[in-house]
């Protein structure tokens, strides 16, 4: 009897600016400022700006510490 292993890459979550404002991170202006300061790393996917959920969670934890 043999077992098979599947190599699955986890699906990463990305947030839009509108989703970040809904989460209470701040206004569009504040989110742009945080990105320019390097506190949130923005990623361009196609013509859209997105933020990695991992980056957002790390930012939230650092501000709550």
From Swiss-Prot:
**Alphabetized InterPro entries for the sequence:** HTH_17
Which top-rank group of organisms is this from? Bacteria
Short name of one Pfam family for this protein? HTH_17
Protein name per its UniProtKB record: Uncharacterized protein PM1772
């Amino acid at each position: 009897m043999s077992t098979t292993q599947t190599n699955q890459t986890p699906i990463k979550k990305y947030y839009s600016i509108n989703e970040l404002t809904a989460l209470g991170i701040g206004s569009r202006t504040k989110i742009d400022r945080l990105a320019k300061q390097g506190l949130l790393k923005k990623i361009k996917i196609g013509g859209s700006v997105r933020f990695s959920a991992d980056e957002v969670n790390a930012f939230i934890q650092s501000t709550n510490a």
